[in-house]
Amino acid sequence: MVDNNKTVDNNYKHTSVLLDEAVNGLNIRDNGIYIDGTFGRGGHSRLILSQLGPEGRLIAIDRDPQAIEAAKSITDPRFSIVHGPFSDLAHYVRELNLVGRINGVLLDLGVSSPQLDDPERGFSFMRDGPLDMRMDPTRGISAAEWLMKASADDIAWVLKTFGEERFAKRLAKAIVERNLTQPMTRTKELADLIANASPFREKHKHPATRSFQAIRIYINSELEEIERALDGALEVLAPEGRLSVISFHSLEDRIVKNFIRHHSRGPQVPAGLPLTEAQLRSMGGRTLKSVGKMMPPDAEVAENPRARSSVLRFAERIKE
């Protein structure tokens, strides 16, 4: 999610990645019911509302208290917002008795620009602030707390699995040794330690890039959240309802791609296995069809470099 805004007041300035493309892919119906699973600062929500008719409805979700505060500027009666993780979207829809009636779900994955740009959130190695990294600072433990209690093996696993960090063991050892003598509580402390412990620097990439991504993903259970959100979207979508998902790195995109691919196939039956038509029907069929994939145009990347790695994928719910 890259939704650039400088403040959390009424003076919003949006640079949502693939804004028009992501919303257009939902095929907005005048009287449709839509979910923006990642409100951020409302770039996608506002565009969806502008395309809905008087009977349309938009339900937004975000676990960041600052996003919930930002949503107060939208007074449109067709709009409502839920404070919570998007992984629980099916639960929210069940409570509203709208399962099977949702015409589109939009998910803009990852960390947002306001989160990255606010030093107090602790997401960025470029700005010194508390070593937090929680998308909802009221829940769970901070990055600093986790790094203090985690073993070198656990830290190395996180750096390797979620950051694809080639020097994971070396960096994990340095983190644990530092915390034994002088616990780290600031982002700059962690970024400097990683930079000093890294034996190799990639061109045009800070040595702490992969590690900060990995720790953030782990602290927020981001990949598990995505998997649950996709399952939830499939549960609540109406026939011909659309799923529109923007991802920002290969781990996210792999989950989305594999989910769409898996649900776009019918039951996998070994050749020659004797099954009746009734048995085949009982195994279920395809529930999604892939509608397409898009990358940001060069002009958008030039204007907003954070869009460079984004991938937008669409799928449509099939009638059962």
Swiss-Prot record:
It comes from the Bacteria. Transmembrane segments: none annotated. The keyword Cytoplasm applies. It catalyses: cytidine(1402) in 16S rRNA + S-adenosyl-L-methionine = N(4)-methylcytidine(1402) in 16S rRNA + S-adenosyl-L-homocysteine + H(+). It is found in: Cytoplasm. GO terms for cellular component: cytoplasm. Its EC number is 2.1.1.199. S-adenosyl-L-methionine binds at G42, G43, H44, D62, F86, D108, Q115. Gene3D superfamilies: Putative methyltransferase TM0872, insert domain, Vaccinia Virus protein VP39. One of its GO terms (biological process) is rRNA base methylation. InterPro entries: RsmH, SAM-dep_MeTrfase_MraW_recog, SAM-dependent_MTases_sf. Keywords: Cytoplasm, Methyltransferase, rRNA processing, S-adenosyl-L-methionine, Transferase. GO terms for molecular function: rRNA (cytosine-N4-)-methyltransferase activity. The keyword rRNA processing applies. NCBIfam families: 16S rRNA (cytosine(1402)-N(4))-methyltransferase RsmH (TIGR00006). Specifically methylates the N4 position of cytidine in position 1402 (C1402) of 16S rRNA. PANTHER family: 12S RRNA N4-METHYLCYTIDINE METHYLTRANSFERASE, S-ADENOSYL-METHYLTRANSFERASE MRAW. Belongs to the methyltransferase superfamily. RsmH family. This is Ribosomal RNA small subunit methyltransferase H. The lineage of its organism: Bacteria, Pseudomonadati, Pseudomonadota, Gammaproteobacteria, Enterobacterales.
